[in-house]
A protein has these predicted regions:
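Feature captures the catalytic cores and cofactor-binding loops of soluble hydro-lyases/lyases
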Residues: 187-306, 311-316
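Amphipathic alpha-helical scaffolding segments comprising HEAT/armadillo-like alpha-solenoid repeats
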Residues: 24-32, 55-74, 94-106, 125-136
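Conserved, function-defining core regions and hallmark residues within catalytic/recognition domains
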Residues: 146-219
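Structural detector for internal amphipathic alpha-helices that build alpha-solenoid repeat scaffolds
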Residues: 15-20, 42-59, 80-95, 101-104, ...
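Amphipathic alpha-helical packing elements
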Residues: 2-31, 36, 324-328, 333-337
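Eukaryotic acidic, Ser/Thr-rich intrinsically disordered low-complexity regions
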Residues: 2-5, 121-155
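Short coil turns that connect the paired helices of HEAT/ARM alpha-solenoid repeats
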Residues: 36-40, 73-81, 104-112, 136-140
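Intein/HINT protein-splicing elements and their conserved insertion hotspots or analogous self-processing inserts
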Residues: 144-163, 299-360
Length: 360
């Protein structure tokens, strides 16, 4: 498995993209390797289980969660992962297969506190939140989780946007539709975000990917600027491709990105929504004086953009919704909605007034 995987890594490297996330079969093999690691491969194996295995309810996540749970409960062992580290890793898996395990570990004297840390930041709890609330009646770790949810710590622990964001412009003229960002002939590769993203704008401009890479050499975040952005059919893949190039890595989640900045003279409503879902800062304003390679300063609270060298104001703007900045901070509109409702429901059960940490 390891040899095949390393060959796959080499092949993908030639295309300038990361390897595919591990599948369930590969994770099963990885588990055996972690139990008795070959000499010299220790760090590599740890990176695979930590950063290259999907989270949530992916079949590979099931295998990962089962192994980490067995480690945390002393049902198996690995020289590389003790029960404390196993519990911490369970806490990075977003929700799904890790939830039941973390709840049961709240009652463990050795790792209960670490399980509480993980659950405090886990939003995809669904009905399992009631189990934690019930357990909190006589378990201090569970009580801490419930208090954390009610205080909205999953949100307040994330950094706010800075007062000013200095960025470099990747400008595409004219109308950029979703087929430009995610071409139909390349549809088979859409589930493989990094591979599909190589096709972005290939019909529209020469060497778009090389252009973006060159802009990144400035060390500044790249902001996507277009006259009319995201028209055409609804395609989440269009957002995925754009954010692959201008977004930020999601910790512990392979081959997917969030955040990023998109400015359009006009942004199509459905495309705007998918950007918002992914935690991007997206807004409409006059882009006529923003050119490829310009360094700009975006003031997200004062709602203006200025040119960095001349300090000339290029445009002012308004957000389409008053909760947009909360969504950016939360890592997307979807985590914001789910997390806010977890906080609200917990406060309701505790008979507390509505939380003030969110913009309503």
């Amino acid at each position: 498995m390891l040899e095949n995987y390393k060959n796959h890594v080499e092949e993908r490297l030639k295309q300038g993209i990361p390897p595919l996330p591990l599948n369930a079969e590969q994770v099963s093999d990885l588990v055996e390797l972690l139990k008795s690691p070959p000499s010299g491969e220790e760090d590599y194996l740890l990176d695979l289980i930590t950063n290259r295995t999907p989270a949530g309810v992916d079949p590979a996540a099931y295998v990962k969660a089962a192994f980490l749970t067995a480690l945390a409960k002393d049902e198996t062992s690995s020289p590389l992962i003790d029960k404390q580290h196993a519990t911490k890793l369970l806490g990075t898996m977003l929700g799904g297969y890790n939830v039941e395990s973390l709840i049961s570990l709240l009652e463990d004297d050795e790792v209960g506190s670490l399980a509480a840390d993980g659950l405090s930041k886990t939003l995809l709890m669904f009905n399992a939140k009631h189990d934690v609330i019930e357990l909190a009646k006589n378990n201090d770790n569970a009580k801490r989780v419930v208090e954390s949810w009610s205080d909205g710590e999953w949100f307040t622990s994330k950094p706010k946007l800075p007062e000013v964001i200095k960025a470099i412009v990747f400008r595409v003229d004219g109308e950029i539709n979703t087929d430009d960002l995610s071409p139909a002939p390349d549809a088979p590769s859409r589930p493989d975000i990094p591979l599909h993203a190589l096709a972005m704008l290939k019909k529209t401009m020469q060497d778009p990917i090389k252009t973006i890479e060159k802009l990144k050499e400035s060390g500044l975040p790249v902001v996507f600027v277009g006259d009319v952005v995201g028209t055409g059919s609804s395609r989440k893949s269009a957002t995925n491709s754009l954010l692959w190039h201008i977004g930020e890595d999601i910790p512990f989640i392979p081959n997917k990105k969030q955040a990023g900045i998109c400015i359009g003279g006009k942004i199509a409503p459905i495309f705007f929504n998918t950007l918002e879902d992914s935690g991007a800062l997206a807004f409409e304003c006059d882009v006529s004086n923003m050119n490829l390679g310009d360094v700009i300063e975006i003031y997200p609270y004062e709602q203006k953009v200025i040119k960095s060298d001349s300090q000339e104001e290029l445009c002012s703007f308004e957000y389409k919704s008053n909760t947009l900045l909360d969504g950016v901070r939360a890592g997307g509109r979807i985590p914001l909605i789910i997390g806010r409702s977890l906080t609200d429901e917990t406060r309701e059960i505790l008979k507390l007034e509505s939380s003030k940490v969110f913009t309503r």
